[in-house]
Amino acid sequence: MPKMKTKSSAKKRFKVTGSGKIKRKHAFKSHILTKKSKKRKLALTHSALVHATDMKSIKQQLRII
């Protein structure tokens, strides 16, 4: 049986850290930035961790489980 392929969309959007947590980027940072404050844009620049409730489905998409 061939190897299972990971979902390419998930592969491009998520990164697994050394401790096994999954990093993601924030949305709302691509266009229409003039009405957003500098503080908000700076906060959206930093990466965040995936919430525990979404962890199982993302790990399945990345074929970690």
UniProtKB/Swiss-Prot annotation:
GO terms for molecular function: structural constituent of ribosome. It comes from the Bacteria. The keyword Protease does not apply. Gene3D superfamilies: 4.10.410.60. Residues 1-22 are annotated as: Disordered. Belongs to the bacterial ribosomal protein bL35 family. Keywords: Ribonucleoprotein, Ribosomal protein. It comes from Flavobacterium psychrophilum (strain ATCC 49511 / DSM 21280 / CIP 103535 / JIP02/86). This is Large ribosomal subunit protein bL35. One of its GO terms (biological process) is translation. One of its GO terms (cellular component) is cytosolic large ribosomal subunit. SUPFAM superfamilies: L35p-like.
